[in-house]
């Protein structure tokens, strides 16, 4: 699940798509409300120790701190890994599906993130839905 956190980079593309504000960093929190990541306005994703773990460019490419491609997220929510293999979809309402089209969870408009058992696994208030979904549900790193 920690590797999924790094995948949050893909969510940065959604800021442009959704028109979210990027003036300051956006915070990802675990189920205990502890900060586990931040997304800077330039697309840099940092862990709770403030170390850079990933970056996403305007094309939706998700790259690690060494600039290696980890995956991509398209404007329609399609998520692909570094081999360009389809690994899932983030629907417009925040529903997340895996490569087999199985429901794995949802990111709600208030920022609450729940898994397929409807258990809260984290919070991403003011974070674009796609970014939160990538962070919590896709292992791109």
Locate predicted features.
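Long terminal segments
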Residues: 2-52, 58-60, 68-69, 75-141
